[in-house]
Amino acid sequence: MYTIFFYNVILYMIFFSQFIKCNNRKIEFYNSYINLKTKGTDNIRFFVLPRIDYPTTIIINNKINFTNDISDSYDFDISDNNINNITLIWNKSLTSTETMFWNCEKIIEIDLSNFDTSSVTTMKSMFFGCSSLYSLDLSNFNTSSVTTMESMFSGCSSLYSLDLSNFDTSSVTNMGLMFFGCSSLYIL
C-alpha cells in the first residue's frame, strides 16, 4: 500500500498485480479498479497522478472507484509530469479540464480519441506549456458546453497541425490567448 499526501487529503492507492502494470517506462491501468479513499469526511475532488520523473508512456482507463460522493464534479490532473505519451480513456462526467496537462513539457503525443468531454464547461489552459506536444487528436471532442478555451494551447510551440473542424464554439465566451506561443502551428 502506498500513501500519497495531497491537499490535506490522504489518498490510499491499493495496487495489486491485476490493477497496475509497471514495466520500465510504461504504466498501464487496466479495466480493474483503483480504489481511492479519503481520511475523515473530506471529499476527493481530484485524481492526481503522482509525479513521474522519467520519460513514461501512460494508459489510463476509466475504472476508478471513489469512496465518497463526488457526483457534483471532480477534476483530473496529470500536470507537470515527465510523461511523453498518454492514452486517456475516461467516460466519467467531467465539468472541467482546466490545466489538465499543464506544463507537461516532455509530452509528445496525447490520444484523446475516446475521451468524453460532453459535460466540460472549461478547457482553460488544458495544454498550456506542453512545448514538446507534436500530435493531438481532438476530432471527437464535444465542445458544445464549453464556455472558456482561454490559453488552451498556449505554449504548444511544437504543435504543427490541429484539426478543430468539429469544435462547437457557440457557447464559448473567452478564447483569449488560445494559440499564444504556438509558433510551429501551420495547419488549423
Question: Which residue ranges define each predicted feature?
Answer:
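Classical eukaryotic N-terminal signal peptides for Sec-dependent ER targeting/secretion
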Residues: 1-9
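Structural signature of tandem-repeat unit edges
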Residues: 84-93, 106-119, 131-147, 158-173, ...
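Consensus positions within tandem repeat domains that build extended binding/scaffold surfaces
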Residues: 98-100, 119-128, 145-154, 173-180
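N-terminal capping/linker segments that flank leucine-rich repeat
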Residues: 10-118
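Broad hydrophobic/π-residue packing in well-ordered secondary structure
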Residues: 38, 60, 88, 115, ...
